Design a protein with these regions (language model features):
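N-terminal localization/anchoring segments of enzymes in phospholipid and broader phosphate metabolism
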Residues: 1-361, 365, 369, 393, ...
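Glycine- and other small-residue-rich loops at beta-strand/loop junctions that grip anionic moieties
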Residues: 188, 380, 414
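A short, conserved beta-strand element enriched in hydrophobic/aromatic residues
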Residues: 294, 377-378
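A general structural signal for well-ordered alpha-helical packing
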Residues: 360, 367, 388, 401, ...
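Helical hairpin unit composed of two closely spaced alpha helices linked by a short loop
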Residues: 380-402, 406, 411
Length: 523
């Protein structure tokens, strides 16, 4: 029986890997490479007399594309990646570039998203949002920038930090039980198991009690985690459900425009975000990668309004009908009286559909304004030159820059890529630690005991450029002390990375890392 279960598990794993390849850019690149090899072979075999014209035409085409790339405003690192692909695949590299840049499969999504934002951008502020002129000098510039992107700064909000998904889950269940009007869930991953089962039990109870419940999860879940018709199953239970951007072979790229956000909103009064999804590994009931270190944050008060608005906007991106006039009933919520809470809170989102790199700008602002320390937890380290330069410059001007990453990787390629950045960071005084008990999935920045971010945004190209993300920025809030305390506690379970660690890396890791770094911006 056990052998049969293992065989089924291996088949499912193989099926999932195959589907990911078919849906992803990897599949496109492999097919392009095979076709080009066949094309070149045919050229050599049957068109020997025309080869000079072929090479001449290919060279002219490549030169034209290179000139076009020089003229556009893409990130320079991404441009270099395309130069490399075009050098190897001069003809089909162009086809791949056009396929990804025109993105025909997502044109409707892009138009709809921009239309929704245009019609709802004035809904973000509330009466208690803070005017920029009243903000402390250390917050004013960043708050002004985020406000221009649709994310106002709030007071009258209590933040509660959770150093583990296990801790957050109990509170999430308690708050779900208190729901009286509506529950909104938006998650990158929903997977059947104990965690989702407990949540679903409460959702069914609340639906029967007349509470409106909406669930949205990313389309990648349908690859191997949930049945493709799972939304219909939930709808039969009275739960409104949408799958964001369902995957379609060669129409949608596997990595583009994924909804990587994690948002739970209850009655517009309590909101959760952070690194945890609705799957058992996030509360350490599954241990494929050792102990799962993740974090979350709960907001109670006015700032929940921004999380609610972000959810409603993304929900309508996947809807056939859009009714912005209905938003008010979920946004204009009378908050219960509470003691005045010091500090400021800015929930914010990031989108791959505009030119505002909100997630990266927030991180860079923290790093560049740090005076004493910047402490970071991130599962992945696949950065552009701007981020590397900011980290190294901060360390060289005397700021303590410490990074905590996993010691047990969930993706070998990502882990190998992270190690390619270690040497430059170490040479410039950045301290790197790896969490020895297992995998760090937390996305946390904390600096100078004054500012912190807890959210979904990794230090990699996917999060900073290709995904929908969200985070919560805290300034002079009491909970920042608990975030820093958790960082220091986590350090006690880490091994410090040094040149010896890099020297002892397996040969394959040393080979894979530099090779994959060439195309890292597209991964």
């Amino acid at each position: 029986m056990e052998k049969e279960d293992n065989r089924i598990l291996l088949l499912e794993k193989g099926k999932r890997k195959l589907i990911q390849i078919v849906f992803g850019r990897t599949g496109i690149i492999i097919v392009s490479l095979i076709v080009q090899i066949l094309f070149l072979f045919a050229g050599f075999r049957y068109l020997e007399g025309f080869l000079p014209y072929f090479w001449g035409g290919s060279s002219l085409l490549s030169a034209a594309v290179v000139l076009f790339l020089f003229g556009n405003d893409d990130n320079p690192t991404i441009k270099l990646t395309w130069f490399f692909i075009l050098a190897i695949l001069p003809v089909f590299g162009l086809i791949l570039y056009i396929y990804i840049k025109t993105d025909l499969g997502h044109r409707l999504m892009i138009r709809r998203y921009n239309d929704i934002l245009a019609q709802t951008e004035d809904l973000a502020p509330c009466a208690d949002a803070c005017p920029s002129e009243e903000l402390p000098e250390g917050l004013r510039n960043l708050a002004t920038y985020l406000s221009s992107c649709g994310f106002p700064c709030y007071r009258n909000t209590e933040a509660e930090y959770f150093p583990l998904g296990d801790d957050a889950f109990d509170v999430m269940l308690d708050e779900l039980q208190k729901a009286e009007h509506f529950i909104f869930l938006e998650y990158f991953i929903v997977k059947e198991g104990y965690m989702w089962g407990r949540v679903l039990e409460i959702l069914k109870e609340k639906v029967n009690a007349g509470v409106e419940v909406r669930v949205m999860y990313d389309g990648t879940c349908a690859v191997a985690l949930l049945p493709y018709n799972y939304p219909k199953k939930l709808q039969k239970l009275g739960i409104a459900c949408k799958m964001f951007a369902p995957l379609r072979p060669f129409v949608s790229t596997h990595y583009n425009y994924r909804d990587h956000r994690k948002i739970m909103v209850i009655d517009g009064k309590v909101g959760f975000t952070g690194g945890i999804n609705l799957s058992d590994e996030y509360i350490n009931l599954s241990s494929r990668y050792g102990h799962w270190k993740d974090t979350a944050i709960a907001l109670r008060g006015d700032a929940v309004r921004s999380l609610t608005l972000m959810f409603l906007q993304m929900w309508d991106v996947s809807s056939l009908h859009f009714a912005p006039e209905s938003y008010r009933q979920y946004l204009d919520i009378a908050q219960p009286p509470r003691e005045k809470t010091p500090g400021y809170v800015i929930p914010y989102g990031d989108s791959p559909l505009d030119r505002d790199l909100v997630g990266e700008m927030v991180y860079l602002d923290i790093i560049n304004r740090a005076n004493r320390y910047v402490h970071i937890m991130t599962p992945y380290l696949i950065m552009d030159n701007e981020m590397v330069t900011a980290l190294t410059y901060a360390a060289r001007r005397g700021v303590e820059v410490q990074l905590i990453l996993p010691h047990v990787p969930d993706k070998e390629i990502a882990f190998s890529l992270a190690h390619t950045y270690y040497r430059r960071l170490l040479e410039n005084g950045v301290q790197i630690y790896e969490y020895e008990p297992g995998f760090v999935h937390a996305k946390v920045f904390v600096s100078d005991d004054r500012k912190a971010v807890v959210g979904t945004i990794n230090l990699d190209y996917r999060s900073l450029y290709h995904h929908f993300e969200c985070g919560t920025y805290l300034y002079e809030a009491p909970e920042i002390a608990n975030i820093e305390r958790d960082f220091q506690q986590t350090l006690t379970h880490c091994v410090r990375a040094d040149y010896e660690l890099l020297k002892n890396d397996p040969f394959l890791r040393k080979l894979i890392g530099p090779a994959m770094r060439i195309i890292a911006p597209l991964l």
